[in-house]
Regions:
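Hydrophobic membrane-targeting alpha-helices
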Residues: 20-23, 96, 119, 181-187
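Short, charged/polar micro-motifs that form catalytic or ligand-binding hotspots
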Residues: 1-7, 80, 99, 158-168
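Alpha-helical transmembrane segments and their helix-start/interface "positive-inside/aromatic belt" motifs
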Residues: 1-17, 101-112
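Long, glycine/tryptophan/cysteine-rich extracytoplasmic
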Residues: 21-77, 123-164, 209
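Intrinsically disordered terminal tails
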Residues: 1-6, 22, 30-36, 185-209
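A hydrophobic membrane-anchoring alpha-helix module
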Residues: 163-190
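Hydrophobic alpha-helical transmembrane segments of integral membrane proteins
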Residues: 84-132, 191-209
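Hydrophobic alpha-helical transmembrane segments
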Residues: 13-15, 19, 76-96, 108-116, ...
């Protein structure tokens, strides 16, 4: 790989560290009784409220409609996600250090696979929370209603408008993957180095013939 491509790959790998600092995803709830709104931030190893009491307020609302409480300690993915991201960082840096284009391609494929599996798992998590309701103890019961928030976008849930979008850490992951793709594409456009045959080499070739 060219020096420029390797620098891009190093930058892409180090950008993953931002996901340990910034939240990956955000879910916002807006309703007339909450003019400032409620928010939930999904981090690499935790789920927190946008404001100090937001997560507890969301859990109290969930109780009214029979949804389970959101307990970060019970979410297994939050325990393994830091190791997955750290592994991606290490693989990317190793590919840049060794400088093999196929390793950079493999890193991109592994990264994309992790992203797809992560989004699918997040959808499943949302589906379970929105459909697995305790209707016997729910105060508000709406037959046939589920409360699954959208994976990406906005959805009306009773009098709440739920919005689910990537947060700063999620965008950092997208930039990281994009930089890796650019590094491979730039390296693929390199022109092969033409070897100039010197006069002495021509003479040696003539002697051999």
């Amino acid at each position: 790989m060219s020096p420029r491509a390797r620098i891009l790959l190093v930058t892409a790998s180090l950008a993953l560290a931002l996901a340990f600092v910034w939240p990956l995803w955000a879910v916002y709830l807006h309703a007339p009784q909450y003019p400032e709104g409620l928010g939930m931030l999904i981090r690499v190893n935790d789920v927190t409220g946008l404001k100090p009491n937001d997560l507890e307020s969301i859990n109290n609302l969930n109780h009214y409609i029979g949804m389970k409480r959101i307990e970060p300690d019970s979410i297994n993915e939050l325990r393994i996600m830091p190791y997955i991201l750290a592994g991606l960082m290490a693989l990317g840096l190793a590919a840049a250090a060794i400088g093999r284009r196929w390793m950079a391609k493999a890193w991109i494929l592994v990264f994309a696979a992790v992203a797809i599996v992560g989004l699918a798992d997040f959808y499943k998590w949302e589906y379970d929370y929105g459909h697995d309701l305790d209707l016997e103890n729910a105060i508000i019961k709406v037959p046939g209603m589920n409360y699954q928030p959208p994976l990406i976008g906005t959805k009306q849930l009773l009098n709440f408008r739920a919005t689910s979008i990537p947060a700063a850490g999620g965008y950092a992951l997208m930039v990281s993957l994009a930089l890796g793709v650019v590094a491979v594409l730039l390296d693929g456009r390199r022109k092969p180095v033409e070897r100039t045959v010197t006069v002495p080499e021509r003479r040696r070739a003539a002697v051999v013939l």
